[in-house]
Amino acid sequence: MMIKKVERFFKSDAAGGIVLIAAAALAMLLANLNATQELYTGFLSTPVELKFGALEIKKNMLLWVNDALMAVFFLLVGLEVKRELVQGSLASRRQASLPVIAALGGMVLPAALYLAFNFQDPITRAGWAIPAATDIAFALGILALLGSRVPPALKVFLMALAIIDDLGAIVIIALFYTSSLSMVSLMVAAGAIAVLAVLNLCNVRRVGVYILVGVVLWTAVLKSGVHATLAGVIIGFFVPLKAQKGHSPAGTLEHALHPWVGFLILPLFAFANAGVSLDGVTLAGLASLLPLGIIAGLFIGKPLGISLFCALAVKLKWATLPPGVSQKTILAVGVLCGIGFTMSIFIASLAFGDVDAALVTWAKLGILVGSLLAAVIGYALLRSHLSRAP
C-alpha cells in the first residue's frame, strides 16, 4: 500500500516541485543550525578534480552542481523549447517573439528600479544587474506545484522567457562583471558548435555523438569564463527533432532526462544553493537602500516589466498571447520570474565580492526576501487564476 502511494506521488505532476522545495528548506535549515552549519558548508566546499591528459578542471562541489549538473537541466530545457518552436505553441513568429519581448521588459525595469534606490552610491550602483536575473529552476519548480492545472503553453512561455533572461544575464556578466575571457576557449567552443551544426545538417541521429561533442563544448565554455550552463541549451537545439521510423532523437533524450532532472539534479541544485546563512542579518538592515532596491526590482520590477512589455507587444501586433494564456496569467508568471535567487546571488558576489563582504550579505538578504515574496505571491496568483479558468 505504501509503495503504491509513493509511486503515485512520483508520477504526479507536482512531485518534482515538492521535492525541490523540500531540498531548499533542508538546505536553509542546515545552513543556519550551529550543529550542522560547518558540515553543510564543508560539504559544498569539498574540492573535486578532473584530469584528462593536459586538461584539468578543479572545482568545489557547489560549482560542479551549478556548472555541470545544471548544464544537463539546460539541455532538457533546450530540447523542450526547440520542440515548441518547431511543432508547438511557439511555432509562429508572433508567438515566439513574445517571450523575447517579455524577457527584455523583465530585465530593463528591475534594473531601473534598483538604480532608483542606489544611483547616488557609486559602490552599490554596480549591483544594477542583480534583480535582472531569473532563477529558471526555482521558477519552474514552483510552477510544477500546480500540476496539471498549468496550460502547457504557459510552461513553455516561462521556460523560453527564463532562458532568454538567463542568456541576457550571461551577456551582462561577460560584458560588465568578467575581467577577462579566454579567446582560445571561445574559439574551441565555436568550433564545437560548428560540428554540432554539421551533425544536424547531415541528419546524424545518434544522440551519443551530440553528447560527446557537447562535452567538448561544455569544457570550452567553462574554461572561457562564460557561464557553462549555456552549453546545455546549445546542445539541445542541435539534437534532431524530426521523427524517422517512429524515432525522434530529441524526443527520446527528453523523455530519458525528465526523471533524472526532476528528482535528482534540481533537488541537488536546490540543496546546494538555498542554504543562505542568516548570521549577522537583522531586520533593521532590510531598510537600507541596497536590499530595498533588490526587493523592489525582483518583486515589483519583474512582473511590471514583463506584463507591460507583453501588453504593448500584443497591442502593437508584434506578438500574440499563447493559447489558453491571458494578460492576468502573464502578470502572475511575471511575479514568479522575480525569483532571482542563485543567478542574482552570483551577480551580487561578482559586483561586491572584492569590495565589501557585508554588501554581499545584505544583497543576499534582499535577494532572499524578494525571491521568497515572488515565489509565494506568484504561486498564490497562479493557483487562484488557474482554478477559476474554464
Swiss-Prot record:
Keywords tagged on the record: Antiport, Cell inner membrane, Cell membrane, Ion transport, Membrane, Sodium, Sodium transport, Transmembrane, Transmembrane helix, Transport
GO cellular component: plasma membrane
Coiled-coil stretches: none
Membrane-crossing residue ranges in chain numbering: 14-34, 61-81, 97-117, 126-146, 156-176, 181-201, 221-241, 256-276, 280-300, 305-325, 330-350, 362-382
Biological process (GO), any one: regulation of pH
Compartment(s) where it occurs, according to its Swiss-Prot or TrEMBL record: Cell inner membrane
GO molecular function: sodium:proton antiporter activity
Membrane topology (UniProt): Multi-pass membrane protein
InterPro entries: Na/H_antiporter_dom_sf (IPR023171), NhaA (IPR004670)
Predominant subcellular localization, coarse grouping: membrane
Reaction equation(s) it catalyzes: Na(+)(in) + 2 H(+)(out) = Na(+)(out) + 2 H(+)(in)
Family indicated by similarity: Belongs to the NhaA Na(+)/H(+) (TC 2.A.33) antiporter family.
Function field: Na(+)/H(+) antiporter that extrudes sodium in exchange for external protons.
Protein name: Na(+)/H(+) antiporter NhaA
Biological source species: Cronobacter sakazakii (strain ATCC BAA-894)
Organism taxonomic ancestry: Bacteria, Pseudomonadati, Pseudomonadota, Gammaproteobacteria, Enterobacterales
Encoding gene, per UniProt annotation: nhaA
